[in-house]
């Protein structure tokens, strides 16, 4: 497991990496490279694994989707989505309920300080900071690309 700053990845960014979705995958690949170098810790919700499987099995096939998710599990810390997170998400007025679940899943880890997403305006600033992959990487001196 990687060390360093602990960041939460929204499902879209993980999918960019796993499915090599252009032009977004460059930034997603760079995030995973930092994790592989133990410069950051990537966190992903349990909910993302289900969503990713659903999408990846349509893009590829079920076996390849599972293989990609097994590799992903070796690179990330999985955050919880339980009763408390569902209750908190239901109590908010997010445009997208899945984003609310992601937000409260990220908050289960006290030292996650940012969600990396391509939909940063879907996350209320008063709950958690959200940045695009480009914004996050632009601030880092250890990103060599």
Kindly label every feature range from the protein language model:
Residues 99-142:
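Acidic, metal-binding active-site segment of PIN/NYN-like and related structure-specific nucleases
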Residues 6, 29-96, 100, 104-109:
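PIN-domain endoribonuclease scaffold, especially VapC-family toxins
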Residues 1-44, 57-64, 125, 131, ...:
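Short, well-structured N-terminal submotif of metal-dependent ribonuclease cores
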Residues 12, 83, 116-118:
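Short beta-strands and strand-loop turn motifs
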């Amino acid at each position: 497991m990687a060390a360093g700053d602990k960041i939460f990845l929204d499902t879209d960014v993980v999918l960019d990496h796993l499915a090599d979705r252009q032009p977004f995958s460059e930034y997603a690949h760079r995030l995973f490279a930092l994790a592989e170098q133990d410069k950051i810790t990537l966190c992903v919700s349990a909910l993302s694994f289900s969503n990713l499987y659903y999408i990846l099995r349509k893009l590829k096939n079920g076996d390849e989707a599972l293989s990609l998710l097994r590799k992903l599990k070796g690179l990330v810390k999985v955050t919880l989505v339980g009763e408390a997170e569902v209750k908190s998400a239901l109590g908010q007025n997010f445009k997208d309920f899945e984003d609310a679940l992601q937000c409260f899943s990220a908050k289960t880890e006290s030292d996650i300080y940012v969600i990396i997403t391509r939909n940063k305006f879907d996350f209320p600033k008063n709950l958690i900071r959200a940045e695009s992959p480009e914004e996050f990487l632009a601030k880092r001196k250890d990103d060599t690309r």
